[in-house]
Amino acid sequence: LTISEVQDLYKKYINPNQTKIFSSLPFGKEIFDSAEGVFMHTLSGKKILDFTGGLGVLGLGHNHPDILKARINFQREKNLEVHKIVFSRYMAALSSSISFLLPANLNKSFFLNSGAEAVEAGIKVCYKSFNSKKKFILYSDKSYHGKLIGSGSISGSYKKDQQFPQMENC
């Protein structure tokens, strides 16, 4: 696909506003096709330093060799990916290891798919911990915590654009 075709598809099927913003920036005129370490590479041959770290998911960089090696070995052995509907020895072992690092009363793990889900779970833990007696949640208003109702309610930058109801007292 050309950059124009990609932009058209983004506009039609993903987010017209995001398309407008990205298209106005220099990187919005490029197609990125590969990445390694802290650099992303475009089809036109440019090497761009990625300051975002994948918005928090690429702390070790793009395609880190140790992670790639582990992934390749995992796939070569035809291991079952982490699956929440059946027993997973990986989740069992990881949760056991995590429990040794935390205080004794924090001995359960709850595996989630995203940061927004983690924030939502944190809100629920607060609610349960105080038996619904607390009426407010302390949060940073210059923040982004996710796009779900709860996480969006405590995201300062997202609240003004959100077209959904907010949690009370946020």
Name each region found by the language model.
Residues L1-E36, V86:
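Active-site-adjacent loop/helix segments that line or gate small-molecule/cofactor pockets in enzymes
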Residues T2-Y10, I67, Y90, L94, ...:
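General structural feature for long, well-ordered alpha-helical segments within catalytic domains
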Residues N15, I48, G54-V86, A93-N113:
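Glycine-rich phosphate-binding segment of PLP-dependent enzymes
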Residues K29-L49:
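Active-site and channel-lining beta-strand-loop segments
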Residues E36, F51-G53, S140:
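A secondary-structure boundary/capping signal
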Residues H41-T42, L60-G61, S153-S155:
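Short beta-strand-to-turn element immediately C-terminal to the catalytic PLP-Schiff-base lysine
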Residues S96-C170:
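PLP-dependent aspartate aminotransferase-fold enzymes
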